[in-house]
Amino acid sequence: MSAILSVDDLNDFISPGVACIKPIETLPTAAPPAGDANSSLEVEVILDGQQPEAKSNAPPAEISLTDCLACSGCVTSAEAVLVSLQSHNEVLNMLDSAPALKLVGPDANGKHSVQGLENSDAKLYVASVSPQSRASLAAACGNGVTEQQAGRMIEQLFLGEQGLARGGKWGNKFTWVVDTNTAREATLVLGSDEVLGGLIAPSDKAATPVLTASCPGWVCYAEKTHPYVLPHLSRVKSPQALMGTLLKTSLSRILDIAPERIWHLAVMPCFDKKLEASREELTDAVWAGDGKPGRGVRDVDCVITSKEVLMLAASRGFDFFSLSASMPPQTPRFPDQLIHDFLFRPGHRQQSREAGTSGGNMHFILRHLQAKNPGSQIQTVPGRNADVVEYKLIAEAGEVMFKAARYYGFRNIQNLVRKLKPAKTSRMPGGKPFGSAKRPAGKASGLDYGYVEVMACPGGCTNGGGQIKVDDQVVVDRKGLAVKPGPQEQKEWQKEVDEAYFSGDESGSRAQDESLDLVVDGISPSHIRNVLTHWSTLTGIQLERLAYTSYREVVSDVGKEKKMTDTERVVQLAGKIGGGW
């Protein structure tokens, strides 16, 4: 390696671009009537360094959060832009806006009703929490607090009288807090069926190799920078998105209320999840409309990170770590028995270390295929660094049945997309192709994988940008650190977070799964398919609209030649002729 460029000089941060792909356009005012003394052409001349006089009647500039998806900034710096748009303050403002809707029932006929609908601002509050966020908060608690115990503290925050209800204008609290692990299990089965051709698969299947699409940072990067990989992205929604769709569709149809009356908060390890929640593909315009993306009601109304959970408690005037880790208050039953059993299963299933810290999409596919082929073995081949690993499923006879890989971090992702880039064909008759087309088919590493698990963060989702870091003041104070933590301390801290993530009770697996045909890592694919089919029947919506999503190339006009106005032409011409004003 060159002495000028070392590994220490490299990182995954890309500075935001200075140009906006959606510049503010000022519409021309109506032309003055003929004969007006002021109707002659006037050109405003501005000296260098001066700003034009603001027009008092100019319309306010508006840039929607969806427009941010098309910005020229990078995906890893998106959190700096979006943190003020979806934050803990938005949660508090919403809770204090009006009395919450209350679920009543069931009555003698098994029907539920909702009280408070006469107030148009009233909402039914539901929160979903990721296991990575629970692990981060558990590590911050210290003293051997497990992920499950941290989860109970979060439930006390959202459901208990000593949580957010304390000090609020209306004393509002959430009706339910659900675990995104349940939605993750559904996405694992859906993803396996998509890759292996199972019973449930999207009509528009992804091209091989199928690439994970549950990481919004990676998806945003692909849409803006490498659109040629979009056909490879898995069509299965992320656990956050699937949970949002499940809650909004089920509750709105069962309770006969509009989707906007249900307010869904997600607690995630990543700031880029705020980007995901703003996607037009994840609104009721898709599942309740014509199936096409549009500006409808979001399936996830707000996303906050693990760090912001602490800020949420502090804004109400108490310390999150003072909350009890005991069982939370009893909540109403979900108004559908099968979905209730799916969302609120007893126990807490332990995460598999082999599956990693990002949900285990690839590992589940391998284990599912292995379960169908007795005697086969999974072989692991380490890559160039810890965030690149290749996996092979070897049949009992010795042949390779399936290959998959794990690529974490943008440095490794860039190597992956380079291998997937289509070859440039020569324009000369009989010319040789360029790039990857020179290599024989099947020889290029990365192209013969059946599945690739791609995550933007090195180390996976437990190392997300919204996680609590070792140099955060709360960790420094609770650990009593005398000096500022460095990279080595962060590595040790990450190990603590990972240990909390893998903590759990093995007895938490569903006992009823054992009686079914096939169980993979404690998950019954047939049981998940039954739940998904029931969900589709209950809502009257095709599963294609509920469980799958789409992607689109984001085209930027940065660097493209733009049309000049008459004023700009006059100024440019004067500069050329007279040497400038």
UniProtKB/Swiss-Prot annotation:
<feature type="binding site">
    <location>
        <position position="74"/>
    </location>
    <ligand>
        <name>[4Fe-4S] cluster 1</name>
    </ligand>
</feature>
<dbReference type="Pfam" id="PF02906">
    <property type="entry name" value="Fe_hyd_lg_C"/>
</dbReference>
<dbReference type="GO" id="GO:0051536">
    <property type="term" value="F:iron-sulfur cluster binding"/>
</dbReference>
<feature type="binding site">
    <location>
        <position position="20"/>
    </location>
    <ligand>
        <name>[4Fe-4S] cluster 1</name>
    </ligand>
</feature>
<protein>
    <recommendedName>
        <fullName>Cytosolic Fe-S cluster assembly factor nar-1</fullName>
    </recommendedName>
</protein>
<keyword id="KW-0479">Metal-binding</keyword>
<feature type="binding site">
    <location>
        <position position="270"/>
    </location>
    <ligand>
        <name>[4Fe-4S] cluster 2</name>
    </ligand>
</feature>
<feature type="binding site">
    <location>
        <position position="461"/>
    </location>
    <ligand>
        <name>[4Fe-4S] cluster 2</name>
    </ligand>
</feature>
<dbReference type="InterPro" id="IPR009016">
    <property type="entry name" value="Fe_hydrogenase"/>
</dbReference>
<feature type="binding site">
    <location>
        <position position="68"/>
    </location>
    <ligand>
        <name>[4Fe-4S] cluster 1</name>
    </ligand>
</feature>
<keyword id="KW-0411">Iron-sulfur</keyword>
<dbReference type="InterPro" id="IPR004108">
    <property type="entry name" value="Fe_hydrogenase_lsu_C"/>
</dbReference>
<comment type="function">
    <text>Component of the cytosolic Fe/S protein assembly machinery. Required for maturation of extramitochondrial Fe/S proteins. May play a role in the transfer of pre-assembled Fe/S clusters to target apoproteins.</text>
</comment>
<dbReference type="GO" id="GO:0046872">
    <property type="term" value="F:metal ion binding"/>
</dbReference>
<keyword id="KW-0408">Iron</keyword>
<feature type="binding site">
    <location>
        <position position="215"/>
    </location>
    <ligand>
        <name>[4Fe-4S] cluster 2</name>
    </ligand>
</feature>
<comment type="similarity">
    <text>Belongs to the NARF family.</text>
</comment>
<dbReference type="InterPro" id="IPR050340">
    <property type="entry name" value="Cytosolic_Fe-S_CAF"/>
</dbReference>
<feature type="binding site">
    <location>
        <position position="71"/>
    </location>
    <ligand>
        <name>[4Fe-4S] cluster 1</name>
    </ligand>
</feature>
<dbReference type="GO" id="GO:0051539">
    <property type="term" value="F:4 iron, 4 sulfur cluster binding"/>
</dbReference>
<keyword id="KW-0004">4Fe-4S</keyword>
<dbReference type="GO" id="GO:0097361">
    <property type="term" value="C:cytosolic [4Fe-4S] assembly targeting complex"/>
</dbReference>
<dbReference type="GO" id="GO:0016226">
    <property type="term" value="P:iron-sulfur cluster assembly"/>
</dbReference>
<feature type="binding site">
    <location>
        <position position="457"/>
    </location>
    <ligand>
        <name>[4Fe-4S] cluster 2</name>
    </ligand>
</feature>
